[in-house]
C-alpha cells in the first residue's frame, strides 16, 4: 500500500493518496516525517485496528447507543440508538420534537423498523418502541439527546475485553490513558501474548484463558462488568462470548464481527452493539 502510493504520486501525479497500514510500528509518531512528499507521499493513513479501537471507545462513552461517530472535529455526533418503550418521544411526529425540546440541537436522520429504512423527509413519521434511530446533534447536547430516547446510562466504569491482539491492546491503552476511574480486565488465550500484555499495560489486569470458559469470565469479574467487549480474531468466539458474558451478568456487550451476514443476526440474539471493521474503514476513507 505504501509503495502503491509512491507509484501513484511519481508516475501518475495523483493528488490524494490514502493508504491502509496495519503494522503498528509504522504508525509510531517518531516516524511521522516518513509520510511527506519528499519521502513517502501518503496524505492520509487508515489503520483498521486504530479505527475499530476508536469506535469501541465511543461505545464506552455512550453505552446506550449501538453506533457513535464523531463529526466536525468532535463538535457533533452521529448516533444510532434504539427507542425504549418509556421514551418520551414515542408516537410523537418527528417535526414536533423542536417544539417539545426547543433548546435541544438534534436532527433525526433515519428510522429503521423491521429491517426497513425510512428517511423522515416531511417529519410526519412517528417513532415506535424497538425502532433503531440515527440522529445527529451537537456534542454538548448528546446527554440530553440520549435522555429523549430514555437512555441515560453513564460512561462505562468497568470494562472486560476478550482478545489481546492489536485491537484489544490499543483499546486497553486508550482506556488507561483517557478514561478516568475505569477498571479494565482483559482475557487473552495465548500465554506468551498474555505475558507480553501484562508487561506493557500498566493498569489492566490480564487473565490467560478462554473467553468462552465461564470460570475464566467469573474470575475476571464479568458479573460486575458494565461493558464486555469481544475483539478476538474469531467472529464466532466474539458473538458467543458476548452472549455468555451477558448471561453471566455483564450489563452491556459489544462484539467485533467481520462477516456482514452475521451482523443482523447478532443484534437479534441480544448483543447490544456490533463493530464491523470493513464498514468502519470504508467510512473513515469517505
What are these regions (language model features)?
Residues 1-286:
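Cytosolic regulatory regions of ion transport systems
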Amino acid at each position: 500500500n505504501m509503495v502503491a502510493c509512491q507509484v501513484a504520486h511519481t508516475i501518475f501525479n495523483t493528488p490524494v493518496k490514502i493508504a491502509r497500514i496495519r503494522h503498528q510500528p509504522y504508525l509510531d509518531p517518531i516516524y511521522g516525517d516518513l509520510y511527506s512528499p519528499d519521502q513517502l507521499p501518503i496524505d492520509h493513513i487508515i489503520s483498521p485496528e486504530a479505527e475499530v479501537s476508536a469506535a469501541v471507545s465511543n461505545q464506552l462513552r455512550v453505552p446506550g447507543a449501538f453506533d457513535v461517530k464523531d463529526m466536525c472535529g468532535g463538535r457533533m455526533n452521529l448516533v444510532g440508538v434504539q427507542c425504549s418503550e418509556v421514551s418520551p418521544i414515542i408516537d410523537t411526529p418527528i417535526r414536533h420534537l423542536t417544539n417539545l425540546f426547543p433548546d435541544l440541537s438534534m436532527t433525526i436522520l433515519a428510522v429503521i423498523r423491521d429491517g426497513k429504512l425510512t428517511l423522515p423527509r416531511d417529519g410526519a413519521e412517528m417513532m415506535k418502541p424497538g425502532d433503531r434511530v440515527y440522529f445527529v446533534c451537537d456534542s454538548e447536547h448528546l446527554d440530553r439527546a440520549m435522555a429523549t430516547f430514555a437512555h441515560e446510562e453513564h460512561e462505562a466504569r468497568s470494562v472486560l475485553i476478550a482478545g489481546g491482539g492489536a485491537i484489544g491492546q490499543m483499546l486497553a491503552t486508550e482506556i488507561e490513558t483517557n478514561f478516568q476511574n475505569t477498571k479494565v480486565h482483559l482475557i487473552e488465550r495465548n500465554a506468551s501474548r498474555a505475558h507480553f500484555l501484562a508487561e506493557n499495560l500498566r493498569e489492566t489486569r490480564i487473565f490467560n484463558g478462554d473467553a468462552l470458559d465461564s470460570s475464566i469470565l467469573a474470575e475476571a469479574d464479568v458479573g460486575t462488568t458494565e461493558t464486555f467487549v469481544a475483539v478476538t480474531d474469531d467472529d464466532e468466539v466474539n458473538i458467543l462470548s458476548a452472549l455468555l458474558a451477558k448471561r453471566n451478568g455483564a450489563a452491556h456487550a459489544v462484539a467485533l464481527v467481520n462477516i456482514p451476514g452475521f451482523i443482523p443476526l447478532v443484534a437479534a440474539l441480544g448483543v447490544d452493539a456490533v463493530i464491523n471493521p470493513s464498514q468502519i474503514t470504508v467510512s473513515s476513507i469517505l
